[in-house]
């Protein structure tokens, strides 16, 4: 309760009038615009009892709707608390899925650190080995970067082979892969001195752009190598039930 930042006041979701308005607005939005999926920002900061009400209202009206919450926390037990899980605890979340930061940090460690008891590729193994706590880990959203963190191509030192290996992990892992725009050509950027450096325009979207990265001719050889790798794996994933719904071994 309070202000998330000085520019972002919280809404009092425990107030019945506010809660009803938010639920009605969510239902209206799906109906009006034909939305088939919700990414719920900063899920952990919400009133979780209210979120269960809102989630249920949306699922009751739209059974095929997909919903997942941003849960920027550390550790699989903490992350799984905010989604449907197998814990025998008082609060039970009914949220379908979460943004899987634990898998992201596992891939990051695997690509940037030597093997150790708790670091390197072992961190990825340890995260995935705890999938049994989720009701359905296949619904979690897996990713390499987003608008709040460093672009992954920069994280791996702009090493094309490491980047392609990371993409291979992403597109052959359990869960629903999410790509942040620009990742398909290896856009770079860190969040320092501010987040604007990972939110640059994709070249070619504006008339004043000197190059058009939407076309093969506008991309460099390295960018096309990354593009082709993603396209090949993504098309394979679309046609492979073993990858999309198979058991994680």
Regions found by a protein language model. Give the residues of each.
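Chitinase-like catalytic core of GlcNAc-active glycosidases
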Residues: 1-23
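Active-site-proximal helices and loops of the catalytic beta/alpha 8
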Residues: 25-27, 31, 42-135, 140, ...
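Short loop/turn motifs at secondary-structure junctions
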Residues: 33-34, 143, 175
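Short catalytic-loop micro-motif centered on adjacent basic/acidic residues
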Residues: 37-43, 152-153
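A structural signal for short, well-ordered beta-strand segments and their strand-loop junctions
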Residues: 39, 68, 143, 178-181
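Substrate-binding cleft of secreted/luminal carbohydrate-active enzymes
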Residues: 167-188
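Surface beta-strand/loop "capping" patches
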Residues: 243-249
């Amino acid at each position: 309760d309070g202000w998330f930042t000085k520019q972002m006041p919280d809404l009092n979701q425990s107030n019945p009038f506010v809660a009803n308005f938010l639920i009605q607005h969510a239902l209206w939005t799906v109906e009006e615009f034909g939305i088939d999926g919700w990414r719920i920002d900063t899920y952990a900061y919400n009133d979780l009892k209210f979120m269960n009400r809102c989630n249920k209202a949306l699922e009751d009206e739209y059974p095929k709707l997909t919903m997942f919450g941003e849960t920027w926390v550390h550790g699989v037990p903490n992350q799984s608390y905010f989604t449907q899980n197998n814990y025998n605890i008082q609060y039970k979340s009914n949220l379908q899925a979460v943004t899987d930061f634990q898998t992201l940090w596992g891939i990051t460690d695997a690509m940037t650190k030597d093997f150790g008891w708790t670091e390197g590729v072992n961190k990825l193994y340890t995260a995935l080995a705890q999938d049994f706590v989720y009701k359905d880990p296949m619904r979690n959203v897996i990713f390499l970067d987003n608008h709040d963190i460093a672009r992954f191509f920069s994280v791996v030192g702009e090493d094309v082979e490491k980047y392609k290996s990371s993409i291979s992990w992403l597109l052959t892992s359990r869960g629903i892969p999410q790509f942040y725009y620009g990742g398909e050509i290896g856009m770079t950027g860190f969040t320092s001195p501010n987040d604007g450096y990972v939110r640059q325009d994709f070249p070619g979207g504006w008339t004043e752009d000197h190059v058009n990265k939407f076309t093969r001719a506008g991309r460099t050889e390295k960018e096309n190598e990354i593009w082709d790798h993603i396209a090949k794996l993504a098309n394979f994933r679309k046609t492979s039930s073993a990858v999309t719904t198979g058991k994680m071994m």
